[in-house]
From Swiss-Prot:
Gene3D superfamilies the UniProt entry points to: 5' to 3' exonuclease, C-terminal subdomain, DNA helicase RuvA subunit, C-terminal domain, Nucleic acid-binding proteins
Family the entry assigns: Belongs to the RuvA family.
Organism: Leifsonia xyli subsp. xyli (strain CTCB07)
Protein's job: The RuvA-RuvB-RuvC complex processes Holliday junction (HJ) DNA during genetic recombination and DNA repair, while the RuvA-RuvB complex plays an important role in the rescue of blocked DNA replication forks via replication fork reversal (RFR). RuvA specifically binds to HJ cruciform DNA, conferring on it an open structure. The RuvB hexamer acts as an ATP-dependent pump, pulling dsDNA into and through the RuvAB complex. HJ branch migration allows RuvC to scan DNA until it finds its consensus sequence, where it cleaves and resolves the cruciform DNA.
Alphabetized HAMAP family for the sequence: DNA_HJ_migration_RuvA
Gene name per UniProt: ruvA
GO BP terms in the entry: DNA recombination; DNA repair
Short name of any one Pfam family annotated for the protein: RuvA_C
Region named Domain II: 64-142
Segments for region (Domain III): 147-207
Taxonomy, superkingdom: Bacteria
Record carries keyword Cell membrane: no
Taxonomic path: Bacteria, Bacillati, Actinomycetota, Actinomycetes, Micrococcales
Protein name, UniProt field: Holliday junction branch migration complex subunit RuvA
Amino acid sequence: MISSLRGTVLSASGGAAVIDVGGVGFAVQLTPDHARSLRVGDEAFVHTTLIVREDSLQLFGFSGLEQLQVFELLNGVSGVGPKSAISVLSVLSPDQVADAVAAADDAPFRAVSGIGPKTAKLIVVSLTGKLAACRRPSAPSARRPSAPSSVSDSVLVALVGLGWPEKVAGEAVAEVIAGTAESERDSVQTLLRLTLARLGPANQAAR
């Protein structure tokens, strides 16, 4: 299973990109907004899931773990394939999907091209109670200083990859951001080091 890619963007347009990883170009299906955010020649990191069918292999890429998790839940709903799942995420954020399901409101899904009334209702019913883990961690108080979202997001992904629960990692990142000077939290390496120091071996052992 290809769970993520990090490499150089060779092309990006519409809802797709090609990312060069070690000399191999991977074609990845993305939301249009995600594809537009990529720049040819820049390094990109995407979370991925591979959809295997009898006649094709398709790699879908996502900017965050929450988006990937929602995609996989949507793709598991009867009548919703990967194309419709990525269409939903092209219109709605993971939080908006969770809010609509929590409110038993199928209107946002009916507004997505390719999703009919019956499928929209089925999405709401099928995903009820399954989306709590797909929400992003609460942001720090507005009175607290913040790190650039790309920096804090990258650190959060790294910590989750190291085995910390996303909630624990998110809280630790927020605490470090709130308690350090801007110059000490303006890079992924520095913020990650400070957050790991705060979590400490005792915290890791307690997980």
